[in-house]
Amino acid sequence: MAPRSVQIVLFDGFELLDVFGPVELFGLLPEHFAVTFLAPGEAPVRSSQGVTVNADHTYAAAPAPDITLVPGGLATREVITDEAFLAWLRGHGTTARLVTSVCTGSALLAAAGLLEGYRATSNKYAFRWVETFGSTVEWVPHARWVEDRDRWTSSGVAAGMDMTVALIRALYGDDVAAEATGMAELDYRTDSTQDPFAALHGL
């Protein structure tokens, strides 16, 4: 069986760990996952931490993926007003077998119409802002991550790694998930409802 293709949607100002936490885990399992990066154009994309990434494909040239992942970051406040980006994301998301997000990436999914009728979560610090998007999204405040059919969304930043472990387990079982977490020496949460940050931010 060929590895599942995982496409990471990049934009200037994305949150670094939103991307490279999951990429670390996927990358430890090359027989199961093949990761590529997407960008608006040919130029490198700069994270909010100043690290630049060269993408494999432009948005326009991206093939249909098995899994797409949309990160968050402070720049989502600007990106979410880009109607051309949202239109592209809407079309791209419909070609993916699984649509996932980390942090405020779920706001982008919601604004693109990709979470209508789904349960979802997001970064708790920004939750009140995020939940203004998507008319029929059921936003879940007390969740480390939420799986709803072909949509997976996580809470803020590091929570993306917990979601990724759960996704790997769902696709390939406990042994493969344990292989990745063992190599990464990752102490992760297995209960998606354990989220201390919801209470911390008054949710």
Task: Please name every model-derived segment.
Residues 120:
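Anionic-ligand binding patches
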Residues 6, 147-148:
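Short amphipathic alpha-helical segments and their helix-coil junctions
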